[in-house]
Amino acid sequence: MAILSIDQGTSGTKALIVSAEGAVLAKGFAPVELTYLAGGGVECDAELLWQSVITAAAMAHGNWDGGKQGIEAVALANQGESVLAWDPDSMRALSPMIIWQDSRSASLCDARLEYADLVRMRTGLTLDPYFVAPKMAWLRENVTRAGVVTTSDAWMIARLAGAFVTDVATASRSLVFDIHRQCWDSELLDIWGLGAERLPTVVANAGIVGSIACADLKFLRDVPLAGLIVDQPAALFAQSCLVPGQTKCTYGTGAFLLANIGAAPRMSTHGLVTSIAWNMRGESAYYYDGQVFTAGSAVQWLVECGLLAGVHEIDALPRDARGIVASPGFAGYGAPRWQPRGTASIAGLSLASTRQELARAVVDGVAAQVAELIGAMGADAVPVQRLRVDGGLTQCRTLMQAQADLAQVPIDVYPHPDATAIGAAALARLALHPALRPADAIPVWRAQQTYEPEWSSDRAQEFLHRWRMVAKHTLNAPDG
């Protein structure tokens, strides 16, 4: 029996059919078009996003010769911090989907700085528009007060199976969820003016929440919906990061560094945030999280500016940017700087500089941001000895070697391009088979390739020093 695992991501929706052994039997994909607005807005048409879910699932099913083998369950991974308003009766979207990169609610965070310590101690998070509650409050103030306002997963689950729920990992990204008691926090909700909102019930990650009843997915009717989780901890699970200290980084639209820190929450003192990775069978795992908001989207900017023809050209870039240093914070900065109004900056250009060298500097800048996060992990007593990586950009040898050089750790490339969907499928299998151990639900994997550092530690530190000097000039840019 197979799992149909849906990964609803920033740039599109993937659907995989995954066998009991973890083999990917079929795939489907449908893109999602984002709109970038003045003032830091990033959104998409929510109904078109939903159609991408239907299209990807139908495509995967259509590409699969199941024979006698049926679909045992549907799993769902979501973006985590993307928000919309919707009608709980008709299921119709009442607003665009406000994407996790959106920073228009920065001023709402500024107005609540007096609560920063309280928020941090209860939620593990920093007051930043990246997280859910500021977007919810901004949407209520600026778009509509009708319907309910939730993260994207609650809406998709309601449309798939009729249940009004969210999973504990997603809830922990909200700024209004107590990660110690694992419940919504009424005081924090009031701080954001959300005390009267109807919120979804919070459920464990490896449980069954209902059966598919969506008219657009008749071929899945009555199949259990199980295995609900945020995309990043799903990838952490897929890469078998089950022991404290094990760390992964996913390189997609952004780059996200997560380290398992065990069964109890710990607060970072170096700018990282703490969230719930998963709760299953009454036991939880927590993680430290650091974010680079523009990784794949920085490469896409290079393409749109004509500096690259496509991602495939990255590995043809020169080995050195000849003094150009880039801090590609096109959507602001997450950990450890937390500067939503920060911008990108490039230094060291001359008349002799080439477009290839500029592109190389941007690629190195992405790796430098991740290296800075790895340093913060070490300062928080979670030293990264090896880094497991996944996502589309891991196929770029130039970026991965730069990452090994700047972070000064070996890089193990996960062999599948769809770690998030594989992780969600493993959680669904745990929901269906109570006797199955978590480690046995995860497909065994070996690194597709390992990158060892070629630079000396001194050379890496010298580069990171120059990069930090450039990054400092990008912070606190004026609104506009």
Language-model features, listed with the residues they occupy:
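N-terminal glycine/serine-rich phosphate-binding loop of ATP-dependent small-molecule kinases
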Residues: 1-95, 121, 145, 218-227, ...
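Active-site core segments that coordinate phosphate-bearing ligands/cofactors
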Residues: 4-6, 110-166, 175-186, 190-191, ...
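Conserved small-residue
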Residues: 15-17, 22, 74, 102, ...
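Short, acidic/turn-prone active-site loops that include or flank metal/cofactor-
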Residues: 30, 35, 98-105, 171, ...
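Short beta-strand-loop/turn "lid" adjacent to the catalytic site in phosphate-handling enzymes
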Residues: 62-100, 122, 126-130, 137, ...
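Short linear loop/turn motifs
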Residues: 199-208, 314-318
